[in-house]
């Protein structure tokens, strides 16, 4: 049984961001899970997790290393299917169906539920081709259409002004922060309903981190965003909701200001106050 705490005993030094105030929550649920369990062989890594993700909101997943948050994130667009011996049980509801049991075209699914990884992973192609590669595969044709999509996506990722004169250069000519924004632009080009971010700033400097955070807040209006982060200050700055994971359990979830200022579970309070990490 979890121990409930009272009073404002969470870490007072975290300044709660303005995401919740600036982005009004909507009632439209874009993606939700019911009783999701994940196994790696005989290891039961994630236990009976149910969460809903709303259009126009950023949800942060926090918790110590190995607690199940990235495992849960990867289940949302069936990335765990790429891991030998991994089994996912429960319902993952997107577009009115349980994608965990449907025979999904994974390529099409990941157009709609995109993912940005911890390390930038641009294709070994030009900046331009990084953006148009997937749309061309899905049938987009015509230089005018492709050019417009490239500009739209790079502007969406706040990268256009920095690269508009070198679109035919290698993506690897960019800095690490620019490469990560290019990966976000590549995701935006598919017009996803959900974007999953798996510690997208862990390899970036503070300036690049701020740029990514501002970018997430600028593109969330038309979609749901889910971010895994070890940076509690980042979670407090960018998210509307926060879910705390511990030892495979989703322990507590709520509005970000409530999670950080008035945690109900002692394990969450201990994590926020540095009793463990």
State each model region's role.
Residues 91-108, 168, 259:
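ABC ATPase NBD Q-loop/coupling interface
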Residues 169-174, 178:
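Conserved ABC ATPase signature
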Residues 253-254:
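ABC ATPase "signature
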């Amino acid at each position: 049984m979890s121990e409930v705490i009272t009073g404002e005993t969470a870490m007072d030094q975290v300044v709660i961001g303005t995401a919740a105030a600036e982005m009004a929550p909507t009632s439209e649920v874009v993606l939700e899970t019911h009783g999701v369990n994940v196994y790696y062989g005989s290891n039961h890594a994630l236990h009976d997790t149910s969460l809903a993700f709303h259009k126009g909101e950023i949800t942060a997943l926090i918790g110590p290393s190995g607690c199940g948050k990235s495992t849960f994130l990867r289940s949302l667009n069936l990335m765990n299917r790429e891991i030998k011996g991994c089994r996912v049980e429960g319902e993952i509801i997107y577009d009115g169906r349980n994608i965990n049991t449907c025979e999904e075209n994974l390529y099409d699914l990941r157009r709609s539920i995109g993912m940005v990884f911890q390390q930038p992973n641009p294709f070994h192609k030009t900046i331009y081709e990084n953006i148009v590669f997937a749309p061309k595969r899905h049938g987009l044709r015509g230089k005018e259409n492709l050019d417009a999509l490239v500009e739209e996506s790079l502007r969406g990722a706040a990268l256009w002004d920095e690269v508009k004169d070198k679109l035919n250069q290698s993506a690897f000519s960019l800095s690490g922060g620019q490469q990560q924004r290019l990966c976000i632009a590549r995701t935006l080009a598919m017009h996803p309903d959900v974007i999953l971010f798996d510690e997208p700033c862990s390899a970036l400097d503070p300036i690049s981190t701020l740029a990514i955070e501002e970018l997430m807040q600028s593109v969330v209006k038309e979609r749901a965003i889910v971010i895994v982060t070890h940076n509690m200050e980042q979670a407090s700055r960018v998210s509307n909701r926060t879910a705390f994971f511990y030892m495979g359990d989703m322990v507590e979830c709520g509005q970000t200001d409530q999670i950080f200022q008035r945690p109900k579970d002692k394990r969450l309070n201990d994590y926020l106050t540095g009793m463990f990490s």
